[in-house]
A protein has these predicted regions:
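Short, structural beta-strand-to-alpha-helix junction motif
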Residues: 3, 17-21, 317, 589
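Fe-S ferredoxin-like electron-transfer domains
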Residues: 46-232, 237-240
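Short beta-alpha connecting loops at secondary-structure transitions
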Residues: 3-5, 69-75, 177-182, 407-410, ...
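Catalytic alpha/large subunits of respiratory electron-transfer oxidoreductases
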Residues: 92, 96, 143, 149-150, ...
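Short, contiguous acidic and Ser/Thr-rich linear segments
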Residues: 11-17
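A basic, amphipathic helix-loop patch mediating RNA/tRNA/ribosome contacts
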Residues: 19-53
Length: 688
């Protein structure tokens, strides 16, 4: 490994790294605008200049210069200071003095570096240039006169998002960043360009003029709007969540965040349930907690356990499902299910229902088979890993299911089970691709597993995995990609029907037939509520969505930003969500509501605090003691032998921007739906 001297200190660094990276290893900060660790090197801002010997007597761009043995690097010499001073002066020539009204103020790289490395005045006396603002959709606000042409946004769109719609046109003072066809930036990751922009050229349109960063309380948590479990930071002021930003987690989301996870937060304040309701004469009226609990108790105590059922929704924390399961057990009911979409997954062998490869390891795959899934919509951050697999390893990616427009080249193999069966028995050519791959991957989506023949599909996929050597001692490429944050946690605790119990479809059919009299909906809104008209429905949740509309008693719960809770992502990683704000009105944490209700129902739980619930959770399943870790999963048997339907697989998501009660209540997501789903998003390029 090369030995280099940085500001008089000799250190040993890995071969092949740049001077800038070597300086960071030595603890020396190098200013930069265009350089970013996850993007290709552009070397066009020249802010990272350093003095290097041996070499020409002029500063060198440290971001693009590889280290060499014996190199001497000076980062604060008179030459370097003068060079940085000059670069900063040139950058500020055309930059407007917008700091007092710029949303980037207080967290702006240009602001900070101008103070640290710039001059106290400008010698430029000519007119500043102005650039027309571009329309990049409902999420990204543009003030292009502020742009310093670092090209981070261009490289992100091209390299990470896979939508090469941004670029630079013109030369000299006529150069500008634009979308080639004057249209919206159509990507589920588009708002990450806001985080990357070192100035105020690209800012958040929904967050414009809302707050300054020093006014906000910052809470580290995780996202629950899909099953990836991205690390996020929730910025709030008093009782309102104002924005959600990504946090660094190399194993899950790196430092990116999907647009829905970032911008659906305005839905947290709309259509909220903030007090209990009881239905009288066909109308819901406000009630006290005691009235609501007593109304539930009257119905529960007049029915046997086999006439009572519970369905858990997609956003539930594991503690709440665990508490509700114990209440149902005490009432003698085996009719419980966390799979409101009807997924044919059992709670037995964990390896049969998680993403065994791990999100980070997906980028090492060299052959991928997607079955009944659209990762671009169902898990955009998983899709970025698959794109890296194509970029870095040249992975061949085959699709069985709907034809998709992904962010990387793919091979359409077929629409349904017959293609999957052909690959499994080796008669399809893609079977050989998987067999010859060093790191083959199969990803099963809910579009394949929520069908009536889901168990047969799962068994066929497992047969394919064995046939094509996808599961080995040093590699497990058998994966299930979930859409719901609550799903893996629910399966882990066994929130599925006991022997002789009913699943979601059975509960709904039983309620329609009059065999199920009481149904508890724990945040379950993605079901056919019309089948519940004859039953007494208790809805516990945070939004006035489908479940609340059909309920006879409504219990106001807390959204994910308003409570502490445990979630398990699609790869089986146990994660902690943390409370950022207080729930509105009389709303309470879900586990606490269930605990209070259990006393009235005669099924009293012993918990006093959330810690008590977590202790019991760990005792029931030790995996919940392994926070933010991946544990090895027993594969066991997957699915059940049977005939598969000839119907094609279909993606479970038709509108990426509205998949849950929070995003459906969001005005920003409604605008995205109008822009990208209901219209083609074309504009003149100068719209606001």
């Amino acid at each position: 490994m090369p030995n280099v001297t940085i500001d008089g200190t000799e250190i040993e660094v890995p071969a092949g790294i740049t001077v800038l990276q070597a300086c960071e290893m030595a603890g020396v900060e190098i200013p930069r605008f265009c350089y970013h660790e996850r993007l290709s090197v552009a070397g066009n801002c020249r802010m990272c200049l350093v003095e290097v010997a041996p070499g020409p007597p002029k500063p060198a761009a440290s971001c693009a210069l590889p280290v060499a043995d014996g190199m001497t690097i000076k980062t604060d010499s008179e030459m370097v200071q003068k060079a940085r001073n000059g670069v900063m002066e040139f950058l500020l020539i055309n930059h407007p003095l917008d700091c007092p009204i710029c949303d980037q103020g207080g967290e702006c790289d240009l602001q900070d570096q101008a103070m640290a490395y710039g001059r106290d005045g400008s010698r430029f006396e000519e007119n500043k240039r102005a650039v027309k603002d571009k329309h990049m959709g409902p999420l990204v606000k543009t003030i292009m006169t502020r742009c310093i042409h670092c090209t981070r946004c261009v490289r992100f769109a091209t390299e990470v998002a896979g939508v090469p719609e941004l670029g630079m046109l013109g030369r000299g003072e006529h150069a500008e960043i634009t979308t080639y066809l004057e249209k919206s930036l159509d990507s589920e990751l588009s708002a990450n360009v806001i985080d990357l922009c070192p100035v105020g050229a690209l800012t958040s349109k929904p967050y414009a003029f809302v707050s300054r960063p020093w006014e906000l309380s910052k809470t580290e948590s995780i996202d629950v709007l899909d099953a990836v479990g991205a690390a996020i930071r929730v910025d709030s002021r008093q009782t309102e969540v104002l924005r959600v930003l990504p946090r660094l987690n190399e194993d899950v989301n790196e430092e990116w965040l999907a647009d829905k996870s970032r911008y659906a937060c305005d839905g947290l304040m709309r259509q909220r349930l903030d007090r209990p309701y009881v239905r009288e004469d066909g109308m819901l009226r406000e009630a006290s907690w005691d009235e609501a609990f007593n109304a539930i108790a009257d119905q529960v105590k007049s029915n046997s356990g086999d006439r009572i059922a519970a369905i858990a929704g997609d956003l539930c924390d594991t503690e709440s499902m665990f508490a509700l399961k114990q209440v149902m057990n005490a009432l003698g009911s085996k009719n419980i299910d966390c799979r409101q979409d009807g997924a044919k997954l059992s709670s037995g062998a964990r390896g049969s229902y998680v993403l065994n490869t791990g999100i980070a390891e997906l980028e090492n795959a060299d052959a991928v088979l997607l079955v009944g899934t659209n990762p671009r919509w169902e898990a955009p951050l998983v899709n970025t890993r698959l794109r890296k697999a194509w970029l870095n390893a040249g992975a061949r990616i085959g699709i069985v299911g709907p034809q998709l427009e992904l962010s990387y080249p793919s091979e359409y193999l077929g629409a349904g089970p017959e293609t999957l069966a052909a690959i499994a028995d080796g008669s399809h050519e893609f079977a050989e691709v998987l067999k010859s791959a060093e790191h083959p991957v199969i990803i099963l989506g809910m579009g394949a597993l929520t069908r009536a023949d889901g168990e047969a599909v799962l068994a066929t996929a497992r047969k394919l995995a064995d046939t094509c050597n996808v599961i080995r001692d040093d590699w497990n490429g058998f994966n299930v990609l979930h859409n719901a944050a609550a799903r893996v946690g629910g399966l882990d605790i066994g929130f599925v029907p006991g022997e002789g119990g009913r699943d979601t479809a059975g509960i709904l059919a039983g309620a329609e037939a009059g065999d199920i009299h009481v149904v508890f909906l724990l945040g379950a809104d993605e079901i056919d509520t019309a089948k519940l008209e004859k039953a007494f429905v208790v809805y516990q949740g945070h939004h006035g969505d489908a479940g609340a509309h059909c309920a006879d008693v409504v219990l106001p719960g807390s959204a994910y930003t308003e409570k502490n809770g445990t979630y398990v992502n699609t790869e089986g990683r146990v994660q902690l969500g943390r409370q950022a704000v207080q729930p509105p009105g009389d709303a309470r944490e879900d586990w606490a509501i269930i605990r209070a209700m259990s006393d009235v129902l005669g099924a009293g739980l012993d918990y006093v605090t959330l810690g008590d619930v977590r202790t019991a959770l760990v005792e029931a399943n030790a995996v919940f003691d392994q926070i933010d870790e991946l544990s090895s999963s027993d594969m066991g048997l997957a699915g059940a032998a049977g005939d598969m339907d000839a119907a094609p697989f279909e993606s479970k998501i038709s509108n990426y921007y509205m998949t849950d009660p929070i995003s459906r209540a969001s005005e920003t997501m409604a605008e995205c739906t109008r822009e990208f789903v209901n219209a083609n998003g074309e504009r003149t390029g100068t719209d606001g």
